[in-house]
Amino acid sequence: MTNAARPELDLLANRRAVETCLEGFLVGKQRAAAEHCMPAEVVQTLRNFVFAGGKRLRPLLCICGWYAGGGAGDMAAVVQAAASLEMFHAFALIHDDLMDHSDTRRGKPTVHRSLAAHHSALRGQEAASHLGTGGAILVGDLALAWSDELLHTAGLTPDRLAAVLPVIDGMRTEVMYGQYLDLCAAGDPTLDLDAALTVARYKTAKYTCERPLHIGASLAGAGLAVLEACTAYALPLGEAFQLRDDLLGVYGAPEQTGKPVLDDLRGAKHTVLLALALQRADAAQRKVLHLLLGNPGLDEHDAVRIRGILTATGARAEVERLIRNRHAQAHQALDQASFPPSTARTLRRIADAATVRAA
């Protein structure tokens, strides 16, 4: 089949295929836990978390990468490899919520809060909270281990598995470093825009967009030119995705984002948005920002004051400009790429949806 004759890449059908794979895998794990008299809440908590929502962006980009690299034929192994990325994402989010002391994710209690609530009646609040913390670490670790299992049982040929493992290893290393950078920067927002962009690139851009595309393309046996074209599209898109997240963390509607709108301000996240505001603020505005950012007792009245400064300094408008710029860069990269036309069209739709969103 020529590139021009390829059918349109059906994102909805591929998303359903990934979710069917995840559901079957986790149902099997629940059965195994029951057979061995393991605590039922462990797998159930992870299953609830995985299916509480989410865009499935990483597995979908993995599948797009496979098509971009010229993949053809049976997709079962590719879908399961893509599903392994969603399981890895669950691991990353569970631990991220714990580090950020977040109460909700996707409108539901975070894993550590859910496990604490499960045990609170019998153990008391303090003991249940401690168990929730330790339990969330273990559930996250289990998701990491199971992402490996999904990959290694996908039925990939030895050469394809050998091609993709270094990419996955690189992705995992980048995520850990990005998360550590984010941890170190939290609570101490500075004027350092480059540092904020570095966190965005390693914590989100590479892991969310670039590496999933690389993994899919590697599964198709793609060469260096395809991988470089994936990077040219994915890095600006991933940065735009994170910049939109930063805006939603301050201005978003909790009923749409599924997260409290005050968390990023209480945590004084070292985002591009806050770095720009601190750069542009006058002495009085900077004093207010340093007074309020990072205050665990910050309330909506305080948040209104901060939002006013972000708008008055032009920081919010500048982040919107950066998003538009990176969105355009992603589209321009597709103009230069030799991807099948149907794949390029799908990647354009993904870029549009990832950067103009309310959740």
Model-derived features: where do they sit?
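All-alpha prenyltransferase/terpene-synthase fold signal
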Residues: M1-A359
